[in-house]
UniProtKB/Swiss-Prot annotation:
Function description: This enzyme scavenges exogenous and endogenous cytidine and 2'-deoxycytidine for UMP synthesis.
EC number: 3.5.4.5
Classification lineage: Bacteria, Bacillati, Mycoplasmatota, Mycoplasmoidales, Mycoplasmoidaceae
Xref: PROSITE patterns: CYT_DCMP_DEAMINASES_1, CYT_DCMP_DEAMINASES_2
Subunit structure: Homodimer.
Sequence ranges assigned to domain CMP/dCMP-type deaminase in this UniProt record: 3-130
GO biological process, one term: cytidine deamination
Protein's name in the database: Cytidine deaminase
Length: 130
């Protein structure tokens, strides 16, 4: 499957506005493609910080709720120009759970620059089910 990264970035730029970030204002949006279907998520902060939901896990929940279990592509959009943004450890483990060897992950900054990773590059020696 060929992806249109320009279109995906435009979608994520619209979706990221839905993030609920009253504490950090660090907005993140995620699009997952699984079996040619798209699933979106945004980060949702909570005054009890451990309850905060990351955009990646939000998108995974949508995907699983729709009956899908294998991620083909992950696009994570950050509202900063940090150049070193990437999923947190908890999200990396969750992404690994539903990824396969060919899963591709893109980390995109708000200037549309991006870095591409494989799931193994993102989480080397991750804990996998047997």
């Amino acid at each position: 499957m060929k992806v249109n990264l320009e279109w995906i970035i435009k979608q994520l730029q619209m979706i990221v506005k839905r993030a609920y970030t009253p504490f950090s204002n660090f907005k993140v949006a995620c699009m997952i493609i699984a079996n040619n279907q798209t699933f979106f998520g945004v980060n949702i902060e909570n005054s009890s910080f451990p309850v905060t939901l990351c955009a990646e896990r939000s998108a995974i929940a949508s995907m699983v709720t729709s009956g899908h279990r294998k991620i083909d592509y992950v696009f994570v959009y950050f509202n900063t120009k940090n150049k070193s943004n990437s999923p947190c450890g908890m999200c990396r483990q969750n992404l690994l759970e539903f990824s396969h060897q060919k899963t591709k992950l893109f980390c995109i900054d708000n200037d549309s620059s991006y870095k591409q990773f494989s799931i193994d590059e993102l989480l080397m020696n991750g804990f996998k089910k047997s």
